Amino acid sequence: LSIDPLSLNVDRWSAIHNFLSGMFCGQYPYGQQTHLGGYGSPFPVWQILHIPFYALGNVGMSIIIVTLLFLWTLNRLYSPKVALVVGILLCISPAFWYEIAVRSDLITNMMLSAIIAEWLVHKNVKLINNVVGIALLVGLTLSTRLIAVIPLCVLYGYEFLQLNWKKQGLFLLIILGTFTLTILPFVFWQGSTLLFFEYNPFVLQTRQGSFLVLLIFACGAIGIT
């Protein structure tokens, strides 16, 4: 974390930092460029979750905190041995250290999704009895990154197919409504930039892999389960 962030050729950290910096200065967040001239792709919930780290002066610290939370979850739900093994595997992983060095938040996002899924499994939270609550959670998770909902799709995909059409419709509407509510403040702020801008977060998140590919992957994972 002592590496000069401006010397990095990865701009995920500045996509968050500059978003929040612009927001607190009254400038439209999704119009703020990264230090490499790009634009931020994370959705609002993920940006807002980084406010404490922004206040501390380093949004890259989120990977440290979420990793510790992930290991604590494994220790609490499984055993200290499981947490230790996973911790060792992370420590010997070049990809993990790369994520830390460049202050990336992608693995952090996925670990947080895994933490949520692990607790839902541990608490035996069934979709049929918790349609509204789980839909709200999925909607908020969707407002981090599109790929972040894959663990929840795998977890609840089969149960969703067992619901009647009314509950299925309610579930999807609540997800869409929750996600929309997180986006609306930025639509009202400067909707043309968010919705019709060439580099809006919807475009950036699907540019390297279409939404159809994501949907096929999620459906395939559900089928396997």
Label every PLM stretch briefly:
Residues T108-V125:
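Specific aromatic-rich, kink-prone transmembrane helix
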Residues I51, P94-A95, N130-G157, L181:
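Membrane-interface alpha helices of multi-pass inner-membrane proteins
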Residues S2-L8, P151, G157, F179-S192:
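Transmembrane alpha-helix/helix-exit interface in multi-pass inner-membrane proteins
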Residues K167-T225:
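Membrane-lumen/periplasm interface segments of specific transmembrane helices
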Residues S2-V59:
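Intramembrane catalytic core of multi-pass membrane enzymes that act on lipidic substrates
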